From Swiss-Prot:
It comes from the Bacteria. It catalyses: [protein]-peptidylproline (omega=180) = [protein]-peptidylproline (omega=0). Keywords: Isomerase, Rotamase. Residues 1-145 form the PPIase cyclophilin-type domain. This is Peptidyl-prolyl cis-trans isomerase. InterPro entries: Cyclophilin-like_dom_sf, Cyclophilin-type_PPIase, Cyclophilin-type_PPIase_CS, Cyclophilin-type_PPIase_dom, Cyclophilin_A-like. Its EC number is 5.2.1.8. PPIases accelerate the folding of proteins. It catalyzes the cis-trans isomerization of proline imidic peptide bonds in oligopeptides.
């Protein structure tokens, strides 16, 4: 089971990945995190009651890592706290992600869900984010069990 600890200006967001349901998307996020890609980036698009989006190196929603990854649509719904891959059309994701504030069933089957907040405190932090809040660091934790 793979996890991420996102340290933000507003607090800590603990995420548990859906390793089996979106293995390539998880591996991409893990690699970018381990390379320090997300460190210092902002949540550039926050819509209260909907979601917080980050992962754009330009801070505008127009950037990515320089490559695209295929969608891995799965049966995990977009619930409060769901981590999902942002994209500009099918198979155009890369580094941008969003975390839902509330259930968003209209996104099911459209975006790759690849994780979930681990606890209520993490979801509170997600909901407290505002445009421009920074990701300070992302630590990946792998449990070999």
């Amino acid at each position: 089971m793979t996890q991420a600890i996102l340290e933000t200006e507003k607090g800590t967001i603990r995420l548990q990945f859906f390793d089996n349901d979106a293995p390539n998307t998880v591996a991409n996020f893990v690699k970018l995190s381990q390379d320090g890609f997300y460190d210092g980036l902002t949540f550039h698009r926050v819509i209260p009651g909907f979601m917080s989006q980050g992962g754009c190196p330009h801070g505008t929603g127009t950037g990515g890592p320089g490559y695209k990854i295929p969608c891995e649509i799965n049966d995990n719904p977009h619930l409060a706290g769901t981590l999902s891959m942002a994209h500009a059309g099918r198979n155009t994701g890369g580094s941008q992600f969003f975390i839902c504030h509330e259930p968003q069933p209209h996104l099911d089957g459209v975006h790759t869900t690849f994780g979930q907040t681990e606890d209520d405190e993490s979801l509170k932090v997600v909901r407290s984010l505002r445009n421009g809040d920074r990701i300070l660091s992302v630590k990946i934790v792998t449990d070999a069990a």
